[in-house]
Design a protein with these regions (language model features):
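Ankyrin repeat A-helix N-terminal signature
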Residues: 31-33, 61-68, 96-102, 129-137, ...
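Ankyrin-repeat boundary/"N-cap" motif
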Residues: 20-29, 50-63, 85-95, 119-131, ...
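Conserved hydrophobic site in ankyrin repeats
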Residues: 41, 75-76, 109, 144, ...
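Solenoidal tandem-repeat scaffolds enriched in leucines and small polar residues
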Residues: 134-256, 260-264, 268-269
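N-terminal signal peptide c-region/cleavage motif recognized by signal peptidases
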Residues: 13-15
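Ankyrin-repeat-protein effector appendages
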Residues: 19-33, 150, 214-222, 227, ...
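N-terminal, post-signal-peptide region of Sec/Tat-exported proteins
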Residues: 42-82
């Protein structure tokens, strides 16, 4: 009876999780998810091989959810899945097994012939992906070494696995000792000369640093590396910066091989208290890294208004552009809040800024639109109102003659297009340098007819042509999505 009740409960929960694939719901996966639960979910129509919008499938999400190894193996062996299948960021299942530290699953995948040298889109291979996420179990690395990975191999900036993982090690250095037993040296350095001490600073463990200091010297890179931190970890405690600056005498202006200062990384991490401390100790607010990024630009990727205020004390750098031609305002319009945008505009940010790719303030604004993000719709409207307040012509065009409506149409978001259509003075029939109207753009790019019908309903002229004399109706025949759908397109005539 208990077993029957469990099955009924599972079926009910699957039904309640809407029509989407239940396997895409991360709450489905945990240490107790059994093969029988997975089988039941498959029987009622959930696909074990389909990819979600982020290119994760059931096996990858299951592995990340730390399911029992038999459950993961069962999923991997389903039709449509294989050891060579790539998921999010081009990663095979071996990447996910390595990052989660599932040694048994790693062995299974290796026995099945999974490629230990496969690279994801970020340049990682499975063993370095394990190191990236701070895996400290020697058995994980031993499995890869036995499969053919050279323990002494170096990656990226000449970093060995010892350097990559030392920040995650405990003060007794068990993992580091394991790597030393494989022939690695504690005193080895990266291509930039960064030491094991420098790499250890990334996790902010002062006691670990004190242990290592007896054996390895720091370089100035330790400070920016501490500020950069490690992936998916909270900000480091302020004590690590105090130790490095006051005890190890590393200057607050120290840079890493990318030219980044600690303040650059603290700004990106939105760490206001540590940023204040660094500035008190002499950090340069106006420093630029090798890509031309200022600390202010980095702060504009987040929403910490007080941090932006702190970094605006050096006003003369507000309109600096980085190597991509992006200014703090262009970044803030895309990535930050309307409050940050308002502050930048009040302090003299130039609304005429255009990146090297031709992105102006209007296109930067449109890039920020994400209706799935809570509060985004209101924030978007407030940013648009601010630009108008500072005399930006919202109906204006970029260097190629594209208006906000042209740009919105290419994004294909119906709500965004409707919003832009409501802007005063927007010309729904404006033509760019190729003679394309928003309707013609939509004819070429739309995935269904709803966008085209919306534009016509708002007054789009179907008779207008491109510089080559082509109408929207003639060009829609080149739209594979619409042609495959078999949709009636006669309304464009």
């Amino acid at each position: 009876m208990k077993k029957l009740f469990s099955v009924i409960t599972l079926l009910a929960s699957i039904s309640a999780m809407s029509q989407q694939n239940v396997f895409f719901d991360r709450s489905f996966w945990n240490e107790n998810t059994s093969v029988s639960q997975v089988k039941t979910a498959i029987e009622v129509g959930n696909s074990p091989s389909a990819l979600n919008e982020a290119a994760f499938d059931a096996p990858s999400l299951a592995i990340l959810g730390n399911v029992p190894t038999p459950t993961a193996i069962y999923l991997i062996e389903q039709e449509g899945n294989s050891i060579t299948k790539t998921t999010h960021d081009g990663r095979t299942y071996l990447f996910w097994a390595a990052s989660s530290g599932n040694v048994a699953l790693i062995h299974y995948l290796l026995e099945q012939g999974s490629d230990i040298y496969a690279k994801d889109t970020k340049g990682y291979i499975p063993v370095t992906f394990a190191a990236l996420f701070g895996n400290t179990n020697p058995k994980v690395y031993e499995a890869f070494f036995r499969a053919g990975i050279d323990p002494k191999a170096t990656y990226d900036q000449g970093e060995s696995l010892l350097l990559k993982t030392i920040a995650f090690d405990s003060e007794q250095l068990p993992l580091t000792q394991y790597f030393i037993s494989k022939g690695l040296k504690l005193k080895q350095t990266s291509l930039s000369g960064a030491t094991a001490f420098d790499y250890a600073s990334r996790k902010g463990n002062v006691n670990l640093l004190k242990t290592l200091r007896k054996k390895v010297k720091p370089t100035h890179q330790a400070l920016p590396m501490a500020a950069e931190g490690v992936i998916r970890q909270p900000n480091n405690p302020i004590e690590v910066y105090q130790y490095l600056i006051e005890n190890q005498k590393i200057p607050a202006t120290a840079t890493d091989y990318k030219g980044g200062t600690a303040l650059h990384y603290l700004a990106r991490r939105q760490d206001l208290p540590a940023a204040q401390y660094l500035i008190e100790k002499g950090a340069n607010i106006e420093a630029t890294d090798k890509d031309g990024n200022t600390c202010l630009m980095n702060a504009c990727y987040g929403n910490n208004l007080e941090l932006v205020k702190l970094l605006l004390k050096g006003k003369e750098h507000i309109n600096k552009a980085n190597g991509k031609g992006e200014t703090a305002l262009l970044i803030a319009l895309q990535r930050s809040s309307s409050e940050v945008v308002a502050l930048l505009l009040a302090q003299g940010a130039d609304t005429r800024a255009v990146s090297k790719k031709g992105v102006n303030v209007i296109e930067a604004l449109l890039a920020s639109y994400n209706p799935r993000k809570k509060g985004n719709d209101k924030d978007f409207d407030q940013k648009a109102a601010l630009l108008k307040q500072y005399l930006v012509a919202l109906q204006g065009a970029n260097a190629h003659g594209d208006t906000a409506l042209h740009m919105a149409v290419v994004k294909g978001n119906l709500k965004l297009v409707e919003k832009i259509c409501s802007w005063p003075s927007i010309d729904i029939n404006a033509q760019n340098e190729e003679g394309e109207t928003p309707l013609i753009k939509a004819a070429l790019t739309a995935k269904d007819t709803s966008l085209l019908k919306l534009l016509i309903d708002k007054g789009a002229n179907k008779a207008l042509t491109t510089s080559l004399g082509e109408t929207a109706y003639e060009l829609v025949k080149e739209n594979e999505n619409l042609q495959k759908s078999g949709a009636d397109l006669s309304f464009l005539k």
